[in-house]
Every structure is written in structure tokens, then in C-alpha cells.
Amino acid sequence: MTETFAFQAEINQLMSLIINTFYSNKEIFLRELISNSSDACDKIRYQSLTNQAVLGDESHLRIRVVPDKANKTLTVEDTGIGMTKAELVNNLGTIARSGTKAFMEALEAGGDMSMIGQFGVGFYSAYLVADRVTVVSKNNDDEAYTWESSAGGTFTVTPTPDCDLKRGTRIVLHLKEDQQEYLEERRLKDLIKKHSEFIGYDIELMVEKATEKEVTDEDEDEAAATKNEEGEEPKVEEVKDDAEEGEKKKKTKKVKEVTQEFVVQNKHKPLWTRDPKDVTKEEYAAFYKAISNDWEEPLSTKHFSVEGQLEFRAILFVPKRAPFDMFEPSKKRNNIKLYVRRVFIMDNCEDLCPEWLAFVRGVVDSEDLPLNISRENLQQNKILKVIRKNIVKKALELFEEIAENKEDYKKFYEQFGKNVKLGIHEDSANRKKLMELLRFHSSESGEDMTTLKDYVTRMKEGQKCIYYVTGDSKKKLETSPFIEQARRRGFEVLFMTEPIDEYVMQQVKDFEDKKFACLTKEGVHFEETEEEKKQREEEKTAYERLCKAMKDVLGDKVEKVVVSERLATSPCILVTSEFGWSAHMEQIMRNQALRDSSMSAYMMSKKTMEINPAHPIVKELKRRVEADENDKAVKDLVYLLFDTALLTSGFTLDDPTSYAERIHRMIKLGLSLDDEDNGNEEAEPAAAVPAEPVAGTSSMEQVD
């Protein structure tokens, strides 16, 4: 009995987009369908490693492409694992994959249709060339079913007990009138060679072969007799003597006979088994596209073999772009395909390379792993651990080779810089090598980025530390008050603008024996002359009373108030403890959906307020405190300085409303306006402005 189902909303939207929008590269549909067939063959082959019986009578795994000009259909058929009824319903219509929406967004943003395979929705590309698609599938665990849809928002599923499929899937495309070119033999051959040459299973194309054949008149007579049997009236002929007939020479003639047969289109042996010197760049690019579903060539390639006690061959590719879901925790990584003696085992072997290398694509073919190895055994397998170690080593070599070309490495770092940093955080064994791959903007690098090695070579005489600041953007950090004194002394400062930089700096303490120093934290000291040290001590003594008064006003909002060593032009800043979170890290943790509040309270240590004794505002505050410690304007000014310092130091205001009210009062005083409604002013934490408008105005104007 035929059942009708509605497409899931996002899938319906995707199909509508595919059908109603013009795309020039419609040819990719064949690549996607062949790729899906290859995956289906992979799955049944993997099952057969532990249970040979699953192959049954259909032990030859292959893919067939059959053009039918008479019926205007193109069929792609495989002997893979097939689909049950539930899988047909779910996989081809009612359950949207995670990539469906992402792919539509990519298309709307100007992306290429050929990206479709990367998002796991390649099947729907069939509707680029077909107005109706029929899928017949037979799985070992179910009877055969036929799925069919003309993309009108619904599809049907029908039991097909008399199906001739023993196991596998047959996809029949009923081609649109303007897409009949995909029935031409030459066109199909070119497409298979272009996109699917390195698929691991035979791709058999149904081709027509014309042969000339000599036939006798007897053959023609037989043919005529056959026609007669079909209803034609037989001709009356004179009966001749056999001997007389034999004496005559038999007449023959040549006729053209057209036959159909399947011809394998992908006869090349696996690329990784060949000598790298014999493989062209075009062949690597074609192979990469075949295994990755990418539409672009790879950025770089590493083809190598390891011999000795352990033997394996591998090809690693670095893509030009990062996949859209690279850091999704639920995403199953299928970056490197594992083969054992040319037999495909699996394509999502998470133990084959670490998470930070999730973007690397490729194949590994081991001579030593057992063919029937299970996922559970893989985790404990010593051979796999050695292979993993070698893959990481070769990947690092590949990155170093890319780094030799500045433009290529710029592309690489834009896409995969986060992965390098994740590697530093997670891979202690390779941390030193990975640090050499880091690039940062700095106060001296302009629009370019610098390496840590180059930074060290430019360090000033007497500079003992590698100075850095963390924040949201390069633009903000260039004007940060934290770097004022460092820049005045001619010290270069690294700008770290990605959230992952905070985690990286928790793991690294030095580079080439030069310690890292975060300018947003306590404990930063610059080399000073004896004269500078003497002046610093005098300032500490002179401003001790102001520091105490400011601490009394701010209470537990700050740990302490001290005279700053790092300020040059700003009046004050807020720094965090050496081992606590920086302002940038606080912001990152605030934005965590599942943050641990108790951990946040512990790590968000109290801040230290540093004041600049050379700044006019600070000097005036000092004068006021010394003249009258109970000056009511001082409290409001201290709070205003504190809130402003929170902002310039990268923190978030806990009470933006109070800050705004203080600013409004300042504006009123600047405009010589009376404060008509004291009731609207905040009671805490700032004190009210003094009652005498004239005196208050005078005081604020002096500060300004």
C-alpha cells in the first residue's frame, strides 16, 4: 500500500531553492549520487568484515550508471547496504540534517551549489536535472521499497516485493526536457572522470557498441521467419532440391549490430599506492575532491609512506576553507579515511588524529592492522597510536612547508589559526613546534602579523619579557591604556584578539627563554634607572593618602588602589591578579551558557585600581582630598573614574544606569543647569552632587 509523507519544512525549502533557482554547474548531481553510492558500499563492506553472510549473492560491490534515451531517464544503481523503509522516510524527507539550513544560508550568501555534498544533503541535487526522482532500495533487514517524489512538498513510499534488486539502491532520474545532455555517453564519461575517478568501487557505465557482422542469406531467412511468426504473411517460394541448393555458393553480407554492455570507467589504482613523483597536481586535486566533497583544490598536499617495523602509506590534504561545522561537538569527524591493505575500514576514526587536526583530510592505508578490527579495539591498538603520532608529525611538516609561502600561510592561518591554538592547549608534546606557527598583530607590525621568533629578534636591549594584551579587536587594543608605558619605552606589544588566545596563554609561560607578561594583570615591572626608582617611591608616598581615600570610597569593589607603573596618558586603569582572569577572559566566561557560577566568583578576583600621578585629574583629586577629605564631590568623581576605568580596561559595567546618571549630572553642570529633581538621582553607590549648584559647578569645572 502506497503511503504519502510531507517533506520536513527545511528540506522543502531547500528543494524549492534548487528547483526554482538557476545554477550553471548542474553537473555536480552525478558526483553526489555516486559519492552516496560509494558510502553505501563502504557500509556493507565494513559489516562484511565481521559477518561475510551480509553480502549474500551480491558479493561484487559496484556502482552502475545507465542512460535510457528512449524513456529519458538516467539511473544510478549500487550494490551497497540499501535502505529500510524507515531509513527511506527519514533520510529522504522527514528529518532535516544539521547542514540543511547551513547550506541554504551559504547559498543565499553567494555560495556555490557544488558545496552541497559538504552539508550532507547531496541527494537533493538530483532535482537540478530531474523533475521526478524514483528511489528503489533493498536492505538485508527489510523488503524492497520505492520512494518517489516530484518535489511538490510530498513523497510516496510503496512496498516493491517483485523488485529485482537483491541488495542496494537504484535511483532513477526522470530528466527535464532541457537536461537530455546527461544521457549522452561522452558527457557521462567526462563527468565520471572529472569528479569520481578515484572512487574505491567500480563505476560501470552502460555504453553502446556497434560491430559489423557478416550474415548469410540463411540468417536473413531466419530473421524473416521470425518476423513471420510475429504475424507477417510468409512468402511462397519454390522448393528446390537440396543437392542443387548446396551447389550454389552461399551469399553473405555485412550488417551493423548495436549491443549494450557495462564498461568500468575508473581503472586507476589507488593514488596513495603510487610513487609521489608519478602523481600530478591535477590527480591529487581530483582525488581530494573525490574523498572530501570539496569543490576547490586543496591548499597543500603531503604524500608519504612509513616503512620498517610498521608500514603504512598516507596522503594528507589541507583544504582552502574551514568546514562550517568544524568545532561542533556533536559532529562526527570523517576527515581521514582508514584502509587496511587497500580495503576501506572506516571514515570517522576519531583515534587516527587529534581533535585540533580535524580539518585535515586524507587517507591512511595500513599494512599491519587486522582487517576485522572494531572501533573498540582501535582505541587500545598500539599500531594505531604509532600511525597517529606519525600523522601529527607529518601534518606539522606540512604546515611548516605552507609557512614558507607568506600568502599561502596567510590563507591557512585565517582559516585554521584556531586549530593551531587548540593544538597548543591540548598537545603538550608538540607545543613548542606549534608555537612557531603562531601569528599575531602587534604594536609594530601594522597590517601584517608577526611570529614569536621575529618578535624576540626585535626585542629592545634590557627587555626581559614578551609583552601582550588580550581583547576584542586590534583597533581597541591599539588605543588601550595598558600599553601606554610599554610603547613609550619602545617595547613591542602583541595583540591577542581571539577568545582561544586566553586558553593558549594559560598553557605557555615562555618562548625561547623569554617569559610572557600580560599587561592587563598585576606583576608587570619595567626596568628603571635609579632616578626613576627614586621618583616612583616619592610618588607612592605623596599619593598614599589619595589611594586610601579612593579605596574607602570604592570599598570592596577593588582590592586596593596603587600608583601605576604602566600608565602614561590615562588617569587610571583596573588590573586583575596575576593568576586570575583578565577582563577579556571575564567577558568570555560571562557569555558561556553553561558557566559555573562558583568558579566564576573564584576566578573573577577583586581588581586593583592603578592611578597615574602625572595626570591632571589625579593631581586635582589629590589636592581636594588633602584640602578636605570629606569633600562631597570627590566621592562622585571617584565613582565616575572607576566606572570609566572599567570600560577602558575592558570590563562590563555592573550598573550602567548609575554611570549614565553621573554622566548626565556632569553634562548639567557643564551647561550650568540647576538640578531640579534630586529624587531621580541614584542613592548608591554615588553620593548626590553638593546642594550648592554654584560651588558644585565650580568644583567640576576645575576638574575638567
UniProtKB/Swiss-Prot annotation:
PROSITE patterns given in the database record: HSP90 (PS00298)
Cellular component (GO) terms are: cytoplasm
Q: Where is the composition biased (Acidic residues)?
A: 675-684
Q: Which Gene3D superfamilies match?
A: 3.30.230.80, 3.40.50.11260, Heat shock protein 90, C-terminal domain (1.20.120.790), Histidine kinase-like ATPase, C-terminal domain (3.30.565.10)
UniProt-recorded name of the protein = Heat shock-like 85 kDa protein
Q: Where is the composition biased (Basic and acidic residues)?
A: 227-238
Against Pfam families, the record matches this protein to: HATPase_c_3 (PF13589), HSP90 (PF00183)
Which InterPro entries did the record assign?
A: HATPase_C_sf, Heat_shock_protein_90_CS, HSP90_C, Hsp90_fam, Hsp90_N, Ribosomal_Su5_D2-typ_SF
List the molecular function annotations (GO) for this entry. ATP binding; ATP hydrolysis activity; ATP-dependent protein folding chaperone; unfolded protein binding
Q: What does this protein do?
A: Molecular chaperone that promotes the maturation, structural maintenance and proper regulation of specific target proteins involved for instance in cell cycle control and signal transduction. Undergoes a functional cycle that is linked to its ATPase activity. This cycle probably induces conformational changes in the client proteins, thereby causing their activation. Interacts dynamically with various co-chaperones that modulate its substrate recognition, ATPase cycle and chaperone function.
The UniProt record lists the keyword Cytoplasm = yes
**PANTHER family to which the protein is assigned, alphabetical:** HEAT SHOCK PROTEIN 90 FAMILY MEMBER
Organism expressing this protein natively: Trypanosoma cruzi
Q: Which HAMAP family match?
A: HSP90
What is annotated about its quaternary structure and interactions?
Homodimer.
Q: What is its main location?
A: cytoplasm
* Protein keywords: ATP-binding, Chaperone, Cytoplasm, Nucleotide-binding, Stress response
Disordered, as annotated region: 212-251, 675-704
Per the record, the domain comment is: The TPR repeat-binding motif mediates interaction with TPR repeat-containing proteins.
List ligand-binding residues for ATP: 36, 78, 123, 375
| Transmembrane recorded as keyword | no
Q: Where is this motif: TPR repeat-binding?
A: 700-704
Give the UniProt family note: Belongs to the heat shock protein 90 family.
Q: Where is the composition biased (Low complexity)?
A: 685-695
